[in-house]
Amino acid sequence: DLQVLKPEPELIYGDLRGSVTFDCALGQEMANVAKFLCQLKNGKTCNVVINTLGKKAQDFEGRILLTPKENSHFSVHITGLRKEDAGHYLCGXHPDGEPKEG
C-alpha cells in the first residue's frame, strides 16, 4: 500500500539578514534516496533550493546548508535572510534529487 504523508505545515519566522534552521522528516523508506528542499512558486512549480546531490540555487549560494541526519531526517540552515526567501517550501526525496509531478 502506498502511503502519502502530508505533515502539517510549519510556520517559521526569521529576521531580515538573520538566519533560520528547521528539520525535515521523511519516511524510513527514503533513507537512501536523494533529499531536496524546494521553494513553491505560483502554487505549482517547486524549484530546488538545495539537494543532497550537490545542487544549490544561485540565490541561496553561500547562504544555505543541508545536513543529513539519521532516519531520513535532515536539517536546513539558511543565513542572510532576504525578503525574497519568504514563501512556501517543501521537503522531499527522489532519486533525481528533484520534485516530480504526481
Curated annotation (Swiss-Prot):
<comment type="function">
    <text>Mediates selective transcytosis of polymeric IgA and IgM across mucosal epithelial cells. Binds polymeric IgA and IgM at the basolateral surface of epithelial cells. The complex is then transported across the cell to be secreted at the apical surface. During this process, a cleavage occurs that separates the extracellular (known as the secretory component) from the transmembrane segment. Through its N-linked glycans ensures anchoring of secretory IgA (sIgA) molecules to mucus lining the epithelial surface to neutralize extracellular pathogens.</text>
</comment>
<keyword id="KW-0812">Transmembrane</keyword>
<dbReference type="InterPro" id="IPR013106">
    <property type="entry name" value="Ig_V-set"/>
</dbReference>
<protein>
    <recommendedName>
        <fullName>Polymeric immunoglobulin receptor</fullName>
    </recommendedName>
</protein>
<dbReference type="InterPro" id="IPR013783">
    <property type="entry name" value="Ig-like_fold"/>
</dbReference>
<keyword id="KW-0472">Membrane</keyword>
<keyword id="KW-0677">Repeat</keyword>
<dbReference type="InterPro" id="IPR050671">
    <property type="entry name" value="CD300_family_receptors"/>
</dbReference>
<keyword id="KW-0393">Immunoglobulin domain</keyword>
<comment type="subunit">
    <text>Interacts (mainly via CDR1-like domain) with dimeric IgA. Interacts (mainly via CDR2-like domain) with pentameric IgM. Either free or part of the secretory IgA (sIgA) complex that consists of two, four or five IgA monomers, and two additional non-Ig polypeptides, namely the JCHAIN and the secretory component (the proteolytic product of PIGR). Free secretory component interacts with bacterial antigens toxA of C.difficile and eaeA of E.coli.</text>
</comment>
<keyword id="KW-1003">Cell membrane</keyword>
<dbReference type="Pfam" id="PF07686">
    <property type="entry name" value="V-set"/>
</dbReference>
<keyword id="KW-0964">Secreted</keyword>
<dbReference type="GO" id="GO:0005886">
    <property type="term" value="C:plasma membrane"/>
</dbReference>
<dbReference type="GO" id="GO:0005576">
    <property type="term" value="C:extracellular region"/>
</dbReference>
<dbReference type="InterPro" id="IPR036179">
    <property type="entry name" value="Ig-like_dom_sf"/>
</dbReference>
